[in-house]
């Protein structure tokens, strides 16, 4: 599979999965993911009939489907009732992934309000339970490194620094859990994209998520509008032996499709074999 075919588009909650598959098939996009929290893709709407039809449509178009949980759901919950709800939420996503034959589910490390250590411990517990269940049913989870928030913000995402990401991956070792590398998030912290590549186990890399930014704030810009060196990024990641997919996550669907050519061009200029 050539590099362009390995670059997909994040449907998010923009369209139904059925519409998203049709859109991707028309444009030759081979990788898509979607969030299933609200209409038109609410988790509870995926009965056997709907899952069968989606599986058939994706298979016929040779489209690889993934799911993406909502980062606003705090996976680092430790409060009674809410903690149990987190486990149920992740299990429900995994169950739908199995029914859809979705190849991955992106999960998040949670967020904290100043109680970082307690939240990280709770998050590892929830993700450990989810990855054990995924292992049992044949699903794969991708844990995403998150974005920095301004220092005076009340809420802060976890695993936005290399050190925090290492905390998670050192404790979550089942094969069913891999890494979703969001490069624009890494670009917001001193570690940078290179720091994450050097500091985490690249053999666990499941996907690379792409948007541009200026390194100042969490803004998902189209590649070329910020200052990320995408040529260098591709050079480093491809040199690691990574053969998986990249996922565009910015703008609208057409922006993400159009940017695939720009990204391939940046890779080729950097000496990457895009064939």
Give each language-model segment a name.
Residues 13-15, 36-38, 71-73, 109-113, ...:
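Active-site-proximal loop/turn and secondary-structure-junction residues that shape catalytic pockets
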């Amino acid at each position: 599979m050539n590099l362009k075919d390995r670059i997909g588009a994040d449907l998010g909650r923009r369209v139904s999965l059925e519409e998203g598959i049709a859109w991707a098939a028309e444009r030759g996009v081979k990788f898509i993911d979607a969030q299933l929290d609200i209409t038109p893709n609410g988790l509870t709407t995926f009965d056997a009939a709907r899952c069968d039809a989606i599986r058939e449509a994706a298979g016929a178009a040779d489209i690889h489907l993934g799911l993406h949980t909502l980062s606003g759901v705090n996976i680092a919950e430790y409060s009674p009732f809410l903690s149990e709800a987190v486990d149920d939420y992740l299990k429900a996503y995994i169950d739908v992934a199995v029914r859809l034959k979705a190849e991955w589910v992106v999960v998040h490390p949670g967020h904290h309000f100043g109680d970082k250590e307690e939240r990280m411990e709770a998050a590892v517990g929830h993700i450990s339970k989810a990855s054990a269940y995924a292992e049992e049913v044949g699903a794969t989870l991708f844990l995403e490194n998150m974005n920095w928030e301004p220092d005076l913000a009340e809420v802060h995402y976890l695993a936005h620094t290399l050190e925090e990401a290492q905390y998670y991956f050192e404790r979550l070792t089942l094969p069913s859990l891999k890494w979703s590398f969001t490069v624009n998030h890494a670009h917001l912290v001193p570690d940078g994209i290179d720091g994450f590549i050097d500091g985490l186990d690249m053999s666990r890399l499941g996907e690379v998520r792409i948007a541009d930014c200026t390194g100042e704030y969490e803004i998902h810009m189209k590649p070329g509008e910020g200052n990320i060196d995408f040529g260098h990024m591709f050079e480093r990641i491809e040199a690691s032996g990574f053969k998986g997919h990249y996922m565009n996550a910015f703008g609208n669907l057409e922006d993400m499709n159009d940017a695939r050519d720009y990204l391939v061009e940046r890779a080729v200029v950097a000496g990457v074999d895009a064939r």
